[in-house]
From Swiss-Prot:
GTP binds at residues 16-23, 91-95, 146-149. Its main location: cytoplasm. Residues 70-74 are annotated as: G2. InterPro entries: EFTu-like_2, G_TR_CS, GTP-eEF1A_C, P-loop_NTPase, Small_GTP-bd, T_Tr_GTP-bd_dom, TRAFAC_GTPase_members, Transl_B-barrel_sf. HAMAP family: EF_Tu_A (MF_00118_A). This is Elongation factor 1-alpha. NCBIfam families: EF-1_alpha (TIGR00483), PRK12317.1 (NF008969), small_GTP (TIGR00231).
């Protein structure tokens, strides 16, 4: 008997303007695939509504109540299956830490579903989220034009909104994305094919999700393992834990940790004696593997969360305090304006370090990436910009063109994500 090949796992995020129906679309996908969160089903049973049918509207009301009480039902990390994919919905941007989570790799999205209401068309947040998806390196986008029931399933209106979205996404460099007319509330074209729109012959939303290309593993890039934790295990020694972002690690190879080696002015390195994943020994770890690995001659106090392991032949790139790096950022949320001298905290992979804005080189049009102003005095919410940043402590960062997983970052201050960005290049100071 042949075992079916394991289906690829794909992470998706839902983006789009507030009130365009992200939650309803997620709710409909889960409802129609039989994956409503456990606590909602429990609640239904507790309320003794046995006789009544478990209606979609009721489910959405419960989800909304939970949200208003400040509990986002973990639609974050809700899983469902399509014929060829295991799909995890990793987040929807109502979540405060959406951007931070996406950048720090708590949840690397393979694709985004951009929800646009047929009634409103493209709105400011539609543009911002689309630009953000690109900044975060999301390669595939599926467009769901929702609320078709509110425009009487009118083809002309669909074509108008489709044209707006296509213009926006093409400017951002996206090609070949499906644009699907849906009504999440009525359940049209989400999981079940709609008979209300005979003029549309493309895929349903779930069919489009089933066709998301399988994420490729960057095994040919240099090894990079951002460290999440370090354990000291009796009889074994020091065991750093982290997810392999790029490259591969084999037992017997020598790894070096940065910025630890830079900070201690001596190589913090050693031979890998063993690798474990889910308590099983591994000879070789690949991108996406969450591993613990035992390193000879490295003590628990030498390394910490935020360090990155790489091979001694191609060590992780350290940006020191005398260095700077050039970055492209999008300001998502700042109460006033950002000027030179602003010093928030940079979050990249598992590291967090204070940084200082040294220069504001240019303000960009978020849609086209074209420069609209050289050396602006300040930048504010909604602006995209090229800036020079200086870390106040050494940190591992890589240019996004070389190792994207270590080239993206979030900027946080006052408990919020202020900006998202990517490293363009690193300038060495003397």
């Amino acid at each position: 008997m042949k075992m079916p090949k394991d289906k690829p796992h794909v992470n998706i995020v839902f983006i789009g303007h507030v009130d365009h129906g992200k939650s309803t679309t997620i709710g409909r996908l889960l409802y129609d695939t039989g994956n409503i969160p456990e606590q909602i089903i429990k609640k239904f049973e507790e309320m003794g509504e046995k006789g009544k049918s478990f209606k979609f509207a009721w489910v959405m009301d419960r989800l909304r109540e939970e949200r208003e009480r400040g509990i986002t039902i973990d639609v974050a990390h809700t899983k469902f299956e399509t014929p060829h994919r295991y799909i995890t919905i990793i987040d929807a941007p109502g979540h405060r830490d959406f951007v931070k989570n996406m950048i720090t790799g708590a949840s690397q999205a393979d694709a985004a579903v951009l929800v646009v209401a047929a009634t409103d068309g493209v709105m400011p947040q539609t543009k911002e989220h689309a630009f953000l998806a690109r900044t975060l390196g999301i390669k595939h986008i599926i467009v769901a034009i929702n609320k078709m029931d509110m425009v009487n399933y009118n083809q002309k209106r669909f074509e108008e909104v489709k044209a707006q979205v296509e213009k926006l996404l093409k400017m951002l460099g996206y090609k070949d994305f499906p644009v699907i007319p849906i009504s999440a509330w009525e359940g049209e074209n989400v999981v079940k094919k709609s008979d209300k729109m005979p003029w549309y012959n493309g895929p349903t939303l779930i069919e489009a999700l089933d066709q998301i290309p399988e994420p490729e593993k960057p095994v040919d890039k240099p090894l990079r393992i951002p460290i999440q934790d370090v354990y000291s295990i009796k009889g074994v020694g020091t065991v750093p834990v982290g997810r392999v972002e790029t490259g591969k690690l084999r037992v017997g190879e020598v790894v070096i940790f940065e910025p630890a080696s830079t900070i201690f002015h001596k190589p913090i390195q050693g031979e890998v004696k063993s690798i474990e994943m889910h308590h099983e020994p591994l000879e070789e770890a690949l991108p996406g593997d969450n591993i613990g690995f035992n390193v000879r001659g490295v003590s628990k106090n030498d390394i910490k969360r935020g360090d990155v392991a790489g091979h001694t032949t191609n060590p992780p790139t350290v940006v020191r305090t005398k260095d700077t790096f050039k970055a492209q950022i999008i300001v998502l949320n700042h109460p006033t304006a950002i000027t030179v001298g602003y010093s928030p905290v940079l979050h990249a992979h598992t590291a967090q370090v204070p940084v200082r804005f040294e220069q504001l080189l240019a303000k960009l049009d978020p849609k086209t990436g074209n420069i609209v102003e050289e050396n602006p005095q300040f930048i504010k919410t909604g602006d995209a910009a090229i800036v020079i940043l200086r870390p106040m402590k050494p940190v591992v960062l890589e240019p996004v063109k070389e190792i994207p997983q270590l080239g993206r970052f979030a900027i946080r201050d006052m408990g919020m994500t202020i900006a998202a960005g990517m490293v363009i290049s690193i300038q060495r100071g003397e």
